[in-house]
C-alpha cells in the first residue's frame, strides 16, 4: 500500500527524533509549514531536497514513495556498531571511594538533583551528600573544561521531556564555566517558575533573531520560546551516561 507524503514525512521526522519546529528551523520554514504537510493539507513541497538531506532519507522515497526509505550507505551507517577497533580499546578498572586518584583523574561533585546546581559552579551545602564522579583530565581538556574539575557538576536528569536521548535518571555532566550558546547543543538552564524557586531543566537551545531562544525538548512536538535575557545558562552538558 502506497503511503502519502504526510505519512512519509512524519515517519522520517520521528525516526530522527525531531519536532516539527526543529525540522522547520533546519530547512528555513515555520513549524506550521511542516504541520501543514503532515496533516495532508499540502500534497507536495519545494523543500524535498532539504528535507531529505536533514532526515537522511532518499528524496525519491520522500516525494513519491519510490524505492527504499534510505540509501544503502545511510542504512549501513545506522546499522554499523559504533565500537572502535580493538587497538583503540581502553581499560576499565574497579574503584571505590577509598581508591586513590591517578595522575590523570579528578573528582567532581555528583548532586542528587539539578535543583541544587548553581550557575557559578557552587553547590548548596545542605543538599550535597559528598558523592563524586571521576573524570580523566584528558576528557575535560577535550571538551574545554578546567582540568582540575572546577566548575563541573554532575546530577541525574529528571522527567521524560528529553527522551529518547536523555531518559529519566540519566547522569549528566555540566561545565558551568561554558555558557556560550551553540545552536543544537544541550544546556542546563534556569527560568523563573510559578513560585519563588527557579525552574531548572536540561534542554536543547537555538538562538533566534531579536534576542530570542528556542528551547527544544526531544519528546515534545511544540518548542518553547523565551528571551535570552530571561534564561539563565547554568552550563553546557558535555557528557551523559544512560543505563540500558
Curated annotation (Swiss-Prot):
Residues 20-39 bind DNA. It comes from the Bacteria. Keywords: DNA-binding, Transcription, Transcription regulation. InterPro entries: Cro/C1-type_HTH (IPR001387), Lambda_DNA-bd_dom_sf (IPR010982), LexA-like (IPR039418), LexA/Signal_pep-like_sf (IPR036286), Peptidase_S24_S26A/B/C (IPR015927). Residues 9-62 form the HTH cro/C1-type domain. The keyword DNA-binding applies. GO terms for molecular function: DNA binding. CDD domains: HTH_XRE, S24_LexA-like. Regulates pectin lyase production in response to DNA damage. PANTHER family: HTH-TYPE TRANSCRIPTIONAL REGULATOR PRTR, PTHR40661. This is HTH-type transcriptional regulator RdgA. It comes from Pectobacterium carotovorum subsp. carotovorum (Erwinia carotovora subsp. carotovora). The lineage of its organism: Bacteria, Pseudomonadati, Pseudomonadota, Gammaproteobacteria, Enterobacterales.
